[in-house]
Regions:
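Sec-dependent N-terminal signal peptides of Gram-positive bacterial secreted proteins and lipoproteins
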Residues: 4-24
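Sec-dependent signal peptide cleavage junction
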Residues: 20-36
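Acidic Gly/Asp/Thr-rich repetitive segments characteristic of extracellular carbohydrate-active
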Residues: 40-82, 88
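Parallel beta-helix/beta-solenoid
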Residues: 76, 96-98, 122, 127, ...
Length: 396
């Protein structure tokens, strides 16, 4: 009798699952199973849900994997997506607000890039609360994508942790455009393929929104390119290698001169405990950034000194235009401390080419080497207040 009862229950359960899978297959369906709630797409289970947590089940091809993951990630409700297998997708995933992606040590391979959002308004709160934990994110080409792998724009409260991102030297592993309150922690961003001697693309790009710095946004809407900068960006415990390692960008000349005003300057950028290498340009270049902290980092450019300013290890510069008023307040401080820096023309170089000087510049406790000689290891020009102390300088 017990055996017969088990058979009947199994039959009823199988019929329930079958009916749910084949009803209204144009959209995503759910059915309660022993392992939780099965979420289906195209008559196949794509995830098992427990509350707001979804355990993704890979599908048969890259396009369906991307569609299924995008369905799970869309919307504004709080959700956690667990990727528990290696996954191949055909193009970018577009997560919604309040999304956490846990990828562990699994590899997500894309025929294009991997993460993107398309903002609808020029506001830091247009997209918010995205967390990416883990994963090896790469392009299907062995030489990497000559574009952007993760592009996040007009966003706030973004956290990227323990991820590895591979990109071509001509591309960007992570591009932040007009973002606020971002943490990139314990990540590896590494370029692939061959690096030309004149390549200046960075693996971590911190951008303002202008037609030349954010052409993808300009194609979406011209209104998105109003010169909004980034603020409150923290990069810590990361290993980054590219033509350039990290760059806070500035708008071009000519028609873009209107985006070289004080309101377009990045602020409160922190780079801490990182190992950053530039192969054909600066390891770290912070342009039009009025406040920044770089500390406890190993910073090396392998660029020949004949490349002049591109061969600097750590560069901070105001470009031509109308800069912020030079003050000594904390909102206008550049602090470079306890770093090991190797450069060509200079190891550390700080200068204003704009209408105003920088505010306070602190360079202390660093070990700085320059191929051009010990006297060129550290140069700080055009600052209202300068503190240079307890540094060791060398030629290498």
């Amino acid at each position: 009798m017990r055996k017969l009862r088990k058979i009947l229950l199994s039959t009823i359960f199988a019929l329930t699952v079958s009916t749910t899978f084949f009803a209204n297959t144009a959209g995503t369906q759910t059915v309660t199973a022993a392992s939780g709630t099965a979420v289906t797409f195209k008559r196949k289970v794509i995830a098992y849900r427990t509350g707001s947590v979804y355990n993704f089940v890979p599908m048969g091809n890259a396009a369906d994997n991307r569609r299924a993951l995008s369905l799970l990630m869309e919307g504004n409700e709080k959700k956690v997506i667990n990727i528990n297998n290696n996954v191949h997708i055909d193009t970018y995933l577009r997560p919604g607000n309040n999304t956490t992606i846990n990828a562990g040590k699994h590899t997500i391979t894309s025929d294009k890039g991997v993460i993107i959002n398309d903002p609808t308004a020029a506001s830091y709160t247009n997209f918010k609360n995205l967390t990416i934990n883990g994963g090896i994110w790469k392009n299907s080409s062995s030489s990497g994508l000559a574009g952007t792998m993760m592009r996040i724009s007009y966003a706030s409260n973004i956290s990227i942790n323990n991820t590895t991102v591979y990109t071509n030297y001509k591309g960007h592993g992570i591009e932040l455009i007009s973002c606020s309150n971002v943490v990139v922690n314990n990540c590896t961003l590494k370029a692939q393929g061959k690096c030309s001697k004149t390549c200046v693309e960075e693996q971590l790009q911190i951008d303002l929104a202008s037609p030349t710095t954010a052409p993808g946004l300009y194609r979406l809407s011209k209104k998105l390119c109003n010169g909004t900068p980034c603020k409150n960006i923290t990069v810590k415990n990361c290993t980054i290698q590219g033509a350039r390692g990290i760059c806070a960008n500035f708008a071009g000349a000519g028609n873009e001169a209107k985006y070289r005003k004080a309101r377009n300057y990045h602020s409160n950028i922190t780079i801490e405990n990182c190992n950053v290498t530039g192969i054909s340009a600066e390891a770290i270049a912070l342009f039009n950034t009025k406040s920044a902290t770089v500390k406890n980092c190993r910073i090396t450019t392998k660029t020949p000194k004949s490349r002049n300013s591109y061969s600097v290890g750590l560069a901070v510069a105001y470009q031509k235009g109308s800069a912020p008023k030079a003050t000594t307040k904390t909102k206008n401080v550049i602090s470079l401390t306890n770093n090991a820096v190797k450069g060509g023309q200079q190891g550390i170089f700080v200068r204003s080419n704009a209408s105003k000087k920088l505010g306070t510049v602190i360079v202390s406790g660093n070990t700085v080497s320059a191929k051009k000689g010990k006297k060129n290891a550290i140069k700080v020009l055009s600052a209202k207040k300068v503190k240079i102390a307890k540094n060791k300088t060398k030629k290498w």
